[in-house]
A protein has these predicted regions:
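Glycosyltransferase catalytic domains, chiefly GT-A lineage
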Residues: 1-245
Length: 245
């Protein structure tokens, strides 16, 4: 059972230029029918033009993230914009490509096989994200936990490097909308006193919502071993220096 195609979304600023091209090349190597949306998150004009020229024969969708529409703290050059641009891009893509399967992939990811396993998982389970180190309590600021009224703080973290959404499903639409609404509110995604030392911004919010919506729907894919691993990809293959270092 297959969807017509999935929309894979990625992007980068200047410090992930080479890393982004590495990810794009891996997509080309293993892709047979899915779409790739590439966001300019702060690439200088020469680099952006180089990417568009290099992949001009591919059927890619090129977009520039318009920071002017959002609060100043979205600026990717200041504390990585608190990663608020990521759920915002997912939401905007959802509005443009309604009822499709959407997958965010960080530029540091590498696709290492065709995406059939990931697609099948999303058709059957609706939301995908592998596990990450620690728990909600370990990597979520208490004010975000309070804001989202999270009670299950011992749950495993999910990984924000790859997040998949089957937007044909009603509660997934609600999930994406709440994810975006939280990203717009700094008190939710990056409250006072939070930093990368004690909080994981978009990943922290995604994790809380992941369990909230799956519990409400009585879905148990979070306990499915298949859903704990990086399906069809690896993460943290950055060539340039990473923001967290």
């Amino acid at each position: 059972m297959y969807s017509n195609n999935m929309y894979i979304i990625t992007g980068a600023s200047d410090n992930h230029y080479l890393t982004l091209m590495n990810m794009i090349d891996s997509f080309i190597k293993y892709n047979d029918r899915h779409k790739l949306i590439i966001y300019n998150l702060g690439l200088e004009e020469t680099k952006w033009n180089n990417i568009k020229e290099k992949y001009s024969k591919q059927d890619f969708i090129f977009k520039i993230f318009d920071y002017s529409k959002y609060p100043e703290w979205f600026n990717i050059n200041i504390e990585a914009g608190q990663y608020a641009w990521k759920p915002t891009i997912i939401y905007n893509t959802f509005l443009e490509y309604t009822d499709e399967i959407l997958v965010w992939m960080d530029a540091g990811n590498l696709i290492n096989e065709n995406l059939q396993k990931l697609e099948t998982f999303l058709i059957n389970n609706y939301i995908y994200s592998a596990t990450s180190n620690g728990t909600i309590k370990d990597w979520t600021h208490p004010l975000t936990i309070q804001y989202l009224n999270c009670k299950n703080i011992e749950n495993e973290n999910r990984n924000g490097a790859c997040m998949g959404f089957n937007t044909k499903i009603g509660f997934v639409k609600d999930f994406i909308t709440e994810f975006y609404n939280c990203a717009k509110d700094k008190n939710c995604i990056a409250p006072e006193g939070s930093s990368r030392k004690n909080h994981r911004q978009d990943q922290a919010v995604f994790t809380i919502l992941f369990y909230k919506y799956l519990y409400e729907q009585n879905k148990t894919c979070y306990s499915n071993d298949h859903g704990k691993y990086n399906l069809c990809h690896s993460i943290h293959n950055d060539i340039e220096s990473h923001w967290d270092k």
